[in-house]
Amino acid sequence: MAADPQSSVLLAFALLCLPWPQEVGAFPAMPLSSLFANAVLRAQHLHQLAADTYKEFERAYIPEGQRYSIQNAQAAFCFSETIPAPTGKDEAQQRSDVELLRFSLLLIQSWLGPVQFLSRVFTNSLVFGTSDRVYEKLKDLEEGIQALMRELEDGSPRAGQILKPTYDKFDTSLRSDDALLKNYGLLSCFKKDLHKAETYLRVMKCRRFVESSCAF
């Protein structure tokens, strides 16, 4: 029997509201499957928010005839391209869960500083105005990834740290073409990085808990 769509929405909302366990072994312990489900839902939500924000900025500030050439020029300016992270689902499947979690954490942490200025860019945005707590959402996902790492690493020594990429803050003036292009490029990278983090988490969840939603 097919699941009731309303029940599915309510379940997803309930999972998004669940807090992360603060310590391994905390009582009551959250099952690993629930930790992954929570992380995937949060990553999907953030990726969709980033995509919607990017599209809105594009519609508001970037002439349609210039978008393609600007997008091509942006491709080389994401700091995440300088780390040896998988670029898609197939490459991600060749990495261990711990590696994918570390890359996901790296991507999320690289945006914690810049997004604190994002709400100033979108003070009148209908899309962003409904989700003006991006920093808190990123911190929440960071905590979820760290909870998964504690579970999977089981106290084993961590590998050498990869240099954390950093992004400039968003320009809140929007008074020059340079400021517009800078923000457009940052939003493009934000969208790409969250898509990567979502992909890594979904790959891990699917190969640990085989389910019908693994085709993506």
Curated annotation (Swiss-Prot):
One of the GO biological process terms: animal organ development
GO molecular function: growth factor activity; growth hormone receptor binding; hormone activity; metal ion binding
Cellular compartments per GO CC: extracellular space
Disulfide bonds: C78-C189, C206-C214
Binding site for Zn(2+): H45, E198
Main location group: secreted
Sorted UniProt keywords: Disulfide bond, Hormone, Metal-binding, Phosphoprotein, Secreted, Signal, Zinc
Modified residue annotations for Phosphoserine: S131
Assigned protein family: Belongs to the somatotropin/prolactin family.
The protein's name in its UniProt record: Somatotropin
Organism of origin: Ailuropoda melanoleuca
Name of the gene: GH1
